[in-house]
Amino acid sequence: RFLFNYHMDRIFREQPLDGRVLGIEAHYTPTILPGQTKPLVSWKTDGNIDFHEPSVTVKARKGIVIATGGNTGNVEFRRMFDPRLTSEFQLGGGEWSPQDGSGELAAMAIGAALWGCCNQAMNRNGALRRGAFVGSRTSYVAWKPQSPIWGKVKATGLFVGNWQDCIAVNQAGKRFYDETKPAYPNGTCFGFFDKSGGYVHGDWRNSSKIKPQFRNYIDAACAINEGSQGPDWEAGPQWAIFDSAAIKREQWKIDENSGEEGYFFKADTLDELQEKLTQNPYQKFKMPKGRLAETVARYNAFVEKGVDEDFDKPKPRYKIEQGPFYAAWCTVCTHDTYAGLRVNGKNQVVDMAGKVIPGLYCGGESAGGATQHGMGRCFTAGYIIGAEVVKG
């Protein structure tokens, strides 16, 4: 049976930091879309528990399984691993999967340890993604107005097929990297499955065999810049800047669903566009007057020369000169969780002394120590936990 629309807040244990887990406490958190009065309901109703009290406690008969989806939506939590990830970096999919770290925090309160913390910032770097869409906070996934959660998503965004059509600027109104470069180099880009690439699994000489590929877009996007201010020194948002000619080349159809209010702007001049950016809650830095126009003029000069003297964008092709002009949110988003609760081979949660917390299990992105995400990770943990938890 399933109890939906409740948020787990607390785990009970026989002693504050000792003994078996006993149950949980949760509070009622229905999802009500803007303009509606009734909460969203699951498409599956068979076996669901009809319960709407403000809070509930549930006794655990066999055990407790934490599978709360990770912590990259919790700004203070994720900054323990990567201080750069201040609030402007939105969670990809956060509208429907908040990844608030609640499972980790509840387990830590009864003594659980964290694990694999370096993975969050230093491994595949899947925790940070450069979204394919601009103009909406959910830059990682596109949604249509027909979606049942459209009231939370609010915009489809625009898919950028060719970054020769746009430039990306930081909160100070300056370019910061070659816009055509992808994010972090991982997977097949180094010839992992290409014999001609020279890669041999487990061979420490790979780094000398393979020509390095410089793909530091995300590091550049997260770097302290002219607009960063204490105490947190936020990198601030990034904006895709383009003109009407780019819209035709990209074959975009701009309508009321394309961009989210406060994250997509249009103006007749670049100075007017720059002023509108201050309407975004994360654009805290006020650019010097004329900054955006100066940046575009410099880039247009590179187009005339055919050489990007600042960031080596290959043969910049198109000037940004035909109004109206546009600015679309293209800020790097957070995504996968690789740091989480410490578990053993049976997916039992382990405390700071390396001892198992009896009856407590964790799987999926709330469990730490993994360097790979995806359904395989979830299925494997679910299989193991299912076999173990029934033993009581």
What are these model-predicted stretches?
Residues 1-9, 58-59, 117:
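A conserved beta-strand/loop element that lines the FAD pocket in flavoprotein oxidoreductases
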Residues 122-127, 181-187, 333-338, 365-376:
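Glycine-rich phosphate/pyrophosphate-binding beta-alpha loops
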Residues 104, 110-284:
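An anion/pyrophosphate-binding glycine-rich loop and adjacent beta-alpha core
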Residues 27, 60-61, 66-68, 171, ...:
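Short, well-ordered coil/turn residues at beta-beta hairpins
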Residues 4-22, 27-31:
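A conserved short coil-to-beta-strand element within the FAD-binding core of flavoproteins
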Residues 32-134:
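Glycine-rich loop(s) and the adjacent beta-strand/alpha-helix scaffold that form part
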Residues 106-113, 379-392:
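Internal hydrophobic alpha-helix adjacent to the cofactor/substrate pocket in enzyme cavities
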Residues 285-370:
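A glycine-rich dinucleotide-binding beta-alpha-beta segment and adjacent secondary-structure elements
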